[in-house]
Swiss-Prot record:
Residues 113-146 form a coiled coil. Belongs to the FAM167 (SEC) family. Keywords: Coiled coil. This is Protein FAM167A. Signal peptide: none annotated. The lineage of its organism: Eukaryota, Metazoa, Chordata, Craniata, Vertebrata. Residues 58-80 are annotated as: Disordered.
Length: 204
């Protein structure tokens, strides 16, 4: 059978294409690799172990049969070319007796498969967008919580200084010391109003 008459299947390579800005699935994969995240879902782990076991078993059976054929002095089995050509000619003439999963021909099966893959990709994009949005919301809440905590710390320090100034005014009528009313031990370690208000705390 002429090789030129065999239909060729063109597979598009999307790895070399530029990533679209709204490709949420690609962004999610990049973020997962950056954070080195791995799924620990039991169903996925079981499926992965089952696939690896099947691959290992298939390789072992193939290697074992090859070794037996070599020991027996036999040539490796090969599919007869005539059988392949007959099957291709039968498929080309439309004389296939078995059905293609309920489809009339291979074109309908490919159209249905392409449609299913497109719907799955859309669902994956939606799920990836939701996950990225959820991560952004979590980071935003963390920042807001940190700012709220720093604001409370700053307010507590400010109220403490105001109370100290009021007590010093009530208990002592002497002149204000150069250390902004703070005691000498606090001045020695660098605790002043300037440090508390602008150095040790932040309003984000």
């Amino acid at each position: 059978m002429d090789a030129s008459s065999i239909p060729q299947i063109n597979i598009e390579d999307f790895d070399g294409l530029e990533v679209a800005p709204d490709d949420h699935l690609r962004n999610l994969k990049a973020l997962t690799e950056k954070l080195r995240l791995e799924t620990r879902r039991p169903s996925y782990l079981e499926w992965k172990e089952r696939v690896e076991a099947q691959n290992t078993k298939g390789l072992a059976v193939s290697d074992g049969s090859t070794e037996l054929e070599k020991d027996a002095g036999l040539k490796p089995r090969a599919t007869p070319q005539r059988t392949i050509e007959d099957s291709q000619m039968t498929a080309g003439n439309g004389l296939i007796s078995r059905s293609l999963g309920g489809f009339d021909n291979i074109d309908e099966a490919l159209v249905w498969l392409r449609k299913e893959l497109m719907e799955m990709r859309i669902q994956d994009q939606q799920l990836a967008r939701q996950l990225m949005r959820l991560r952004g919301d979590i980071n935003k809440l963390k920042v807001e919580q940190t700012c709220h905590l720093h604001r409370r710390m700053l307010n507590d320090a400010t109220f403490g200084l105001e109370e100290r100034d009021e007590l010093s005014d009530l208990l002592c009528d002497g002149p204000v010391t150069p250390g902004f009313g703070l005691s000498s031990p606090l001045r020695l370690i660098g605790v002043t109003k300037m440090n508390i208000n602008s150095r040790r705390f932040s309003l984000c």
